[in-house]
Structure formats: structure tokens, C-alpha cells
Amino acid sequence: MTTVDMLIHLHPELSTEIRAKVEKEVRDCNGVITANFDHHQHPHALIVLYNSDVVPSKQILDVARRYDPAASMVGL
């Protein structure tokens, strides 16, 4: 198992409800171990830990882009 951390930047003005939906849908992807927003310092930053042997990063980013087409990913 190869675990990778990834940071996805989303629009800072997304509502709390939309951020919760993104978090849940990303977390529900096969191969994702955890996905959480940094609610205090960077509420637009979704931190994802996933198994890159199971799910490609683009698939995870595509989930976030359903809610914010301009979402971008940064490897950690």
C-alpha cells in the first residue's frame, strides 16, 4: 500500500454545507483513507490521505471539481 497526502484548494467562499458534501464524497472514494478540511486556519484546504495503488489523484480532484470547477491540487 502506497499512501499519499494531497491538498486540494477550493474556493474560500464555499458554504459549510458544500464543504461537508465535498469532504464526504471524497472520503467515500475507494482508496481514500481520510479527507478533512482545515476548518480553523485554511477552511478552503482539503487534506486527503489516500492509497495511490487504488485511486488516482485525478479521480479525487474530479470529485472536488463537481462543486468547484476551479479546484486545484497540491502534493504534500
Language-model-detected regions and their locations in the chain:
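Short glycine-/aliphatic-rich beta-strand segments at the starts of folded cytosolic domains
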Residues: 1-13
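Short acidic amphipathic segments
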Residues: 14, 23-40
